UniProtKB/Swiss-Prot annotation:
Belongs to the pterin-4-alpha-carbinolamine dehydratase family. The keyword Lyase applies. It catalyses: (4aS,6R)-4a-hydroxy-L-erythro-5,6,7,8-tetrahydrobiopterin = (6R)-L-erythro-6,7-dihydrobiopterin + H2O. This is Putative pterin-4-alpha-carbinolamine dehydratase. The lineage of its organism: Bacteria, Pseudomonadati, Pseudomonadota, Betaproteobacteria, Burkholderiales. One of its GO terms (molecular function) is 4-alpha-hydroxytetrahydrobiopterin dehydratase activity. CDD domains: PCD_DCoH_subfamily_b (cd00914). GO terms for biological process: tetrahydrobiopterin biosynthetic process.
Length: 108
């Protein structure tokens, strides 16, 4: 990563991100998305993967059928940064376009 990002307060980050939550054991954001079917979930992940490569910031995520669980943190900074907020906002937009329902449920 060429640019140094400063860690930000989780409450500030969460204020800009509806339905995202603080991870219970880490300095990270988390969210669960539910799609109509696997193809929609996989399409969402493919779109996010291209964006992640573009900004050189990659989510921790898992996919089970129509569900995608996401954790965002910036390892180099030891917590949440503007990169995570930017990724979360992009993910919310991409998920909405794919017809997803965002659920603020504990992921782990």
């Amino acid at each position: 990563m060429s640019q140094r990002y400063l860690r930000m307060d989780l409450s500030i980050a969460l204020g800009a991100l509806p339905q995202w939550q603080a991870h219970p054991t880490r300095q990270a954001l988390q969210k669960r998305y539910r799609f109509d079917h696997f193809n929609a979930a996989f399409g969402f992940m493919s779109r996010v993967a291209m964006f992640a490569e573009k900004i050189d910031h990659h989510p921790e995520w898992s996919n089970v059928y129509n569900r995608v669980d996401v954790v965002l943190t910036t390892h180099d900074a030891g917590g949440v940064t503007e990169l995570d907020v930017r990724m979360a906002q992009f993910m919310d937009e991409a998920a909405a376009q794919a017809g997803a329902t965002g659920l603020s449920l504990p992921v782990y």
